[in-house]
Structures are given as structure tokens and as C-alpha cells.
């Protein structure tokens, strides 16, 4: 491959294949963009991780929770067995917090939920799981406690793909003011030229991955055309397109990660962006 004429390389899509390419000396001086996978890639020279890393999003959400939760709140943490380290970190951040562990079958004991959610102070519940079954059962049980006397808000420090399952009720999440960080904002683009052309060609509206790919390519093209190189384009700062933000910052060994994100909340059957 003649690498002299390459401004950048996008992909491969699979993490294993991307790591192999980034390890090759022939490509060491060429920017290499990891496009779609949320799995961490090897951060070698010239690597751009375009998906905001999970640990970064979690750190930012912890900072947000610290700003909005105080001693007047009743903090309850619901964490499964794979997220006990986050439970511990939350306990250290909120010393008065109470932990609830799901039972076998991913449900919460109704009597325990009823006794821990109070009407004397706001209830701030933090759900730490990436399992659809627990998200569904826990959010439903928590919603059943909501009343004029009991004020409940729901949060998570990491909004994984399980939360996007179409079988989950947006109405339920709206009732709980479910708040989280995300590397994308699922607002409608149905009337845009891109969406119309996509439907005309493929017969269906673009999904999350198609929109992500479009936003990423447009961003990379604009960065190179205006700044001559991807490395120098980090001086631009944050950019935003249909559903995605890009804010590349140095990581290590001349690599870069995207620290663009949205702080989102379910409200009135919709998802809105709130101030960070």
C-alpha cells in the first residue's frame, strides 16, 4: 500500500483488526480512526478513538451526580454483581447511601423497595447494570413507588446499549426523569436531506449506526479540509452534527480520545439535553 497519499485511515471496524493495523510500522505516522466500536482499542501513536470511552463517560457522570446530590437526598444504589466496584465508588462519594442487590432472576424485593423509598426527602436512585432484565424490572418497581408524596429520580453512570431496547418504556423513564450521559443524542433527523436520500435509496430511515457513520465522516472531512491534518484539527475543539459530538483530546503516546458527550434526561415522552 502506498501510504504517502493517505490523510487518514478509518477502521477496521473490529477492535482486534484495528489493533493489528495500528501495530504496523507502515502506518505509524498516519492517523487511524476507530469508528464504531465502544470496546477499547490499543492507544498507539496516531490512534483516534472516536467513541467516547466508557470510563470517561462514567467519570463525568459521577462528577454530575456529586453536583446535584446533597445531604437532603435519600440516595439508593441498585447494582448487579458485575458493577460492585461502581457501587463501592458511589458509597464513598455518598456515605449515607443505601445499597440494594437484585435477587436471582433480576428483580428487587418489593417490601425492601417500599421500606427504602421515603416521602420525607427526595429519592435519588442510581441503577448500575447493563442487563436488560434488571433495567426493566427495577425501573418498573421503582416507578410503582412514585406518588405525590414520594419524589423519585433515576440515574445511571453508564448508559449501555441495553437501555436502548425498544421493549423498555419511555413513559416510565420520563416519569422518573431518567438522567444519564451518552456519546450520542437520539433526536429525530427524519426531515433532513441525508435522511430523505437514505430512505429513497434503502427504503428505511437511517439507524443509529448509519447516522453515527455519517456524522463521523463529515467531521473528519471538514477537519482535514480546514486544518490540513487530523492531528492539528484538535485545536478546533468540540464539533457537533446530527446526533454526535467530537472533541478529541490527547491521551498518551500521541493518541487521542473523543471527549464529546451529551447529558440527557427523559422528559414528557421525549429525551432532552440538559446543561452540563
Language-model region placement:
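Extracellular/periplasmic periplasmic-binding protein-like sensory domains
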Residues: 139-212
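Sec-exported extracytoplasmic/periplasmic mature domains
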Residues: 2-3, 23-27, 66-70, 95, ...
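Segments of small-molecule ligand-sensing domains
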Residues: 203-213, 221-275
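Extracytoplasmic/secreted envelope proteins and their assembly/folding machinery
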Residues: 6, 18-22, 58-62, 87, ...
Amino acid at each position: 500500500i502506498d501510504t504517502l497519499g493517505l490523510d487518514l485511515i478509518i477502521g477496521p471496524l473490529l477492535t482486534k483488526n484495528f489493533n493489528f493495523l495500528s501495530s504496523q510500522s507502515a502506518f505509524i505516522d498516519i492517523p487511524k480512526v476507530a469508528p464504531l466500536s465502544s470496546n477499547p482499542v490499543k492507544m498507539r501513536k496516531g490512534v483516534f478513538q472516536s467513541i467516547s470511552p466508557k470510563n470517561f463517560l462514567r467519570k463525568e457522570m459521577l462528577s454530575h451526580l456529586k453536583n446535584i446530590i446533597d445531604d437532603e437526598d435519600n440516595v439508593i444504589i441498585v447494582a448487579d454483581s458485575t458493577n460492585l466496584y461502581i457501587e463501592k465508588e458511589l458509597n464513598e462519594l455518598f456515605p449515607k447511601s443505601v445499597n440494594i442487590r437484585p435477587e436471582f432472576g433480576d428483580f428487587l424485593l418489593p417490601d425492601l423497595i417500599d421500606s427504602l423509598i421515603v416521602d420525607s426527602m427526595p429519592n435519588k436512585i442510581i441503577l448500575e447494570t447493563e442487563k436488560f432484565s434488571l433495567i426493566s424490572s427495577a425501573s418498573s418497581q421503582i416507578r410503582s413507588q412514585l406518588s405525590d408524596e414520594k419524589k423519585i429520580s433515576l440515574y445511571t453512570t453508564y448508559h449501555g446499549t441495553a437501555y436502548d431496547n425498544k421493549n423498555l418504556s419511555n413513559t416510565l423513564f420520563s416519569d422518573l426523569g431518567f438522567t444519564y450521559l451518552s456519546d450520542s443524542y437520539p433526536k429525530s433527523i427524519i426531515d433532513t436531506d441525508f435522511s430523505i436520500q437514505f430512505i429513497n435509496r434503502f427504503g428505511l430511515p437511517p439507524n443509529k449506526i448509519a447516522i453515527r457513520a455519517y456524522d463521523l465522516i463529515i467531521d473528519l472531512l471538514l477537519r482535514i479540509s480546514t486544518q490540513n491534518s487530523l492531528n492539528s484539527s484538535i485545536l478546533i475543539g468540540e464539533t457537533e452534527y446530527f446526533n454526535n459530538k467530537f472533541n478529541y483530546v490527547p491521551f498518551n503516546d500521541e493518541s487521542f480520545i473523543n471527549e464529546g458527550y451529551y447529558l440527557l434526561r427523559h422528559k414528557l415522552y421525549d429525551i432532552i439535553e440538559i446543561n452540563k
